[in-house]
Amino acid sequence: MCYCGCQRATAEEPTMDEPAELNKLRWRSRRGMRELDHLFDRYLSHRWAQASEAERGVFLRFLDCEDDKLWRWLMGYEVCQDASFAALIVTIRALPA
């Protein structure tokens, strides 16, 4: 089972549920702040499919953080002390626009 509660196949067994899972994640990642919405959409579009289960777990925990903290971390106004979040931030910032 996936983090969002849907049934998820392994990489060898793609299913029709993957687009639905991605849509749920896009909805969950919506913040109403254009900058954050754009960054999270880029991550889901360019990285999610090849991300490891560990990285996916970090991303889902990241979404539980307060919006103002996410914005300060991703914009570089504040350094995130959590090493796994810091690595994810570097990954998100490096994604193509």
From Swiss-Prot:
Subcellular location as annotated: Cytoplasm
Q: Does the keyword Zinc apply?
A: no
**What's a BP term from Gene Ontology annotated to this protein?**
succinate metabolic process
Offer one Pfam family short name for this entry: Sdh5
**Is Chaperone a UniProt keyword of this protein?**
yes
Q: Name one GO cellular component term.
A: cytoplasm
Keywords linked to the UniProt accession = Chaperone, Cytoplasm
The record ties this protein, via InterPro entries, to: SDH, SDH_sf, SdhE_FAD_assembly_factor
Family membership noted in the UniProt record: Belongs to the SdhE FAD assembly factor family.
As for what it does, the entry says: An FAD assembly protein, which accelerates covalent attachment of the cofactor into other proteins. Plays an essential role in the assembly of succinate dehydrogenase (SDH, respiratory complex II), an enzyme complex that is a component of both the tricarboxylic acid cycle and the electron transport chain, and which couples the oxidation of succinate to fumarate with the reduction of ubiquinone (coenzyme Q) to ubiquinol. Required for flavinylation (covalent attachment of FAD) of the flavoprotein subunit SdhA of SDH and other flavinylated proteins as well.
The name of this protein is FAD assembly factor SdhE
Q: Tell me the organism.
A: Xylella fastidiosa (strain 9a5c)
The record lists the lineage as: Bacteria, Pseudomonadati, Pseudomonadota, Gammaproteobacteria, Lysobacterales
